[in-house]
């Protein structure tokens, strides 16, 4: 990086969002004394730097990578972004939708089709500039550095050589990501921070760096950690100390060389946590249960001709049902003729019952008329109570309970209720959703050690830090935010720090606006 002082076309702070993908709640706070470079970023070299610590930040449902990321950088629940899950069935097109493609543009295309604005759109509309590194969501960004097949191939070869596992090496991924941000990959110099400064003589106002290594390392820690059955907190603290903290040192030096460090506000963020897998459930567990009475897709049967579609799962398993009388996917399946037989077959599977925590069943307000009032999006199905009955129609009806009763089954009950109501659209919602016990995952890869996407605090609550030398003119002092926050709040926070009016219609809010009345003085 060239030495000197860089600036954008106007004065103001430079926001760098460091997204530590999959980092659990309070990992940094609990180990900060062992992280000298994080200490400098958060507290400053003398320990007197302004910061705001938000220890309890709720993710959106599902707490899975791309839907959570999309919601975080749009400020909208999945229902409004169109990215409702990692994989889902579209009842109108009969297609299974996934988010991975060679061009890495599927999320951007979904947002464009739905006229959904991103953080980078709002920044651009305000006359400011933005860049991203490693992020798949790039809609509205002026510059973006992405990865490709060569990058991931190298990462996997390196890990196979070092650790004997054909998965991407997390340290390599994060090191190369920071390289990409600061100076670019071989073909991406012009889109890196150094290249933008050299060719455009400015520094972007918003820069996002997505560091995926924590998530990868949580999925596949080294063999010594697995052999001693390390907890997920131990695994993440180890990775933070040995890999991320040295990277932060490189970042600090790079920004100081460019002459912009004193203007920077860092937002240290995460979009989901991680849990150690306790039980592996074969991902195709439901297929033999339903195949006898329901037509499932196959090489000889298309999705449109099937009458049940089972999604790949993690901590949940989703089942889509067709109305077998009309033969139409957009017609609500009949409760007694379509939904009940599927539920009965699922509950007859002993592996399902040993892992099941809760089951919810979709409602269709104003569309289905079978003698029950349908006024919500879901019922909680009392599967244990139903099992104790004769299993007849009246017992099935009685087992359909208000979704609000989900609060009796989960520590985060109210949050989960809201999340379920704000996840799907009419075209993408499944009819049956199984929710597993903590640590129980539909997972065919027995080498995978950790996972996410569950409805438990370890996955659903993360922590944010807002800090850096550029913060004190806006928010002086050191604060711990006492109320709950949301990953949806990232967009309102960034626009606030840049002096951009709050975009209308967001689902998130700005916890920084009244920080004095909602925080205590920090004591780290």
Where would I find each of the regions flagged by the language model?
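Loop/turn elements at helix/coil->beta-strand transitions in domains of secreted/extracellular proteins
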Residues: 11-16, 48-54, 125-131, 201-207, ...
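Beta-strand elements within well-structured catalytic alpha/beta cores of enzymes
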Residues: 12-26, 41-42, 72, 123, ...
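Short, structured active-site-proximal loop/turn typified by the sulfatase FGly-forming signature C/S-X-P-X-R
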Residues: 26-81, 129-132, 477
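His/Asp/Glu-rich, glycine-adjacent segments
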Residues: 71, 76-229, 385-391, 443
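Active-site neighborhoods of enzymes that stabilize oxyanions during catalysis
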Residues: 116, 305-493
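Active-site-proximal cap/lid insertion segments
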Residues: 164, 199-201, 211-260, 278, ...
């Amino acid at each position: 990086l060239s030495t000197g002082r860089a600036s954008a076309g106007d004065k103001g702070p430079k926001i760098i969002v460091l997204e530590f993908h999959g980092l659990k709640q309070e990992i940094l706070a609990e180990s900060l004394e062992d992280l000298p470079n994080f200490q400098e970023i958060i507290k400053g070299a003398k320990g007197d730097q302004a910061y705001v610590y938000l220890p309890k930040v709720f993710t959106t449902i599902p707490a899975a990578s791309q839907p959570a990321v999309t919601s975080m950088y749009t400020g909208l629940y999945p229902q409004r972004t169109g990215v409702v899950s990692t994989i889902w069935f579209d009842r109108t097109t009969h297609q299974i939708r996934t988010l991975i493609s060679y061009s890495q543009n599927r999320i951007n295309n979904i947002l464009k089709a739905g006229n959904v604005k991103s953080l980078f759109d709002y920044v651009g509309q305000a006359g400011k500039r933005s860049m991203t590194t490693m992020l798949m969501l790039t809609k509205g960004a002026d510059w973006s550095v992405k990865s490709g097949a060569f990058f991931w191939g190298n990462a996997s070869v390196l890990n196979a050589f070092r650790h004997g596992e054909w998965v991407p090496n997390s340290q390599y991924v994060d090191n190369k990501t920071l390289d990409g941000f600061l100076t670019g990959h071989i073909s991406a110099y012009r889109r890196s921070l150094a290249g933008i400064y050299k060719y455009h003589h400015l520094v972007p106002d918003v820069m996002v760096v997505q560091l995926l290594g924590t998530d990868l390392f949580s999925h596949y820690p080294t063999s010594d950690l697995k052999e001693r059955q390390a907890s997920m907190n131990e695994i993440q603290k180890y990775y933070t100390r040995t890999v991320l903290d040295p990277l932060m040192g490189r970042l600090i030096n790079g920004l100081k060389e460019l002459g912009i460090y004193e203007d920077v506000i860092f937002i240290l963020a995460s979009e989901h946590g991680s849990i150690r897998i306790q039980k592996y459930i074969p991902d195709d567990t439901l297929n033999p249960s339903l195949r006898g009475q329901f037509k499932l897709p196959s090489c000889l049967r298309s999705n449109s001709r099937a009458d049940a579609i089972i999604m790949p799962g993690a901590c949940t398993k989703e089942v889509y049902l067709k109305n077998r009388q009309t033969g139409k996917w957009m017609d609500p399946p009949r409760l007694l003729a379509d939904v009940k037989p599927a539920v009965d077959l699922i509950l007859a599977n002993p592996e399902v019952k040993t892992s099941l925590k809760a089951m919810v069943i979709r409602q269709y307000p104003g569309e289905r008329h079978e003698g029950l009032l349908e006024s919500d999006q879901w019922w909680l199905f009392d599967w244990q109570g139903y099992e104790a009955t004769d299993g007849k129609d009246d017992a099935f009806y009685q087992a359909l309970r208000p979704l609000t009763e989900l609060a009796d089954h989960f520590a985060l009950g109210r949050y989960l209720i809201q999340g379920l109501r704000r996840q799907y659209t009419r075209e993408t919602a499944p009819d049956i959703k199984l929710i597993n016990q903590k640590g129980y995952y539909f997972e065919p890869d027995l080498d995978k050690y950790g996972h996410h996407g569950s409805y438990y605090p370890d996955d659903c609550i993360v922590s944010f830090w807002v800090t850096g030398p550029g913060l004190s003119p806006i928010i002086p002092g050191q604060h711990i935010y006492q109320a709950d926050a949301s990953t949806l709040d990232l967009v309102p926070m960034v626009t606030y720090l840049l002096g951009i009016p709050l975009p209308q219609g967001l689902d998130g809010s700005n916890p920084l606006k009244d920080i004095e009345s909602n925080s205590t003085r920090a004591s780290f």
